[in-house]
């Protein structure tokens, strides 16, 4: 058995669940009476999605439907970074929603500092878009997981734990 144990802290989401969520949102928008004639389009790209609709009111309704469907499919709402809506031709409104994936250097440094300050028995290493936490005792790693979970709202990113060994 290894003398040290470790796990990775990552910020990721299941892309297929997002695709399924958007399918549900499109279906809901096309059948809902107040949104049926709004000609709403939702386009998913690699790092963002674009919502184009008729007015601010319908845009807000589509956002509400998106949040509700994402929550039901266990997607964190923190993956959505709603940008400012822009007016496009033909009295339509377009909103870009950036999808957060991976830990930025700034957030990784904050997370690393939080863990180092609170827990002395673990070591923290930033590895690209993830943070590896290593310790001799699995109890120390469990304490680190609890600490990171408690600080997740402060960091404003969805966090998952992988490669626990």
Swiss-Prot record:
It comes from Synechococcus sp. (strain CC9902). Nucleotide-binding protein. Transmembrane segments: none annotated. Belongs to the YajQ family. Keywords: Nucleotide-binding. This is Nucleotide-binding protein Syncc9902_1708. GO terms for cellular component: cytosol. SUPFAM superfamilies: YajQ-like. One of its GO terms (molecular function) is nucleotide binding.
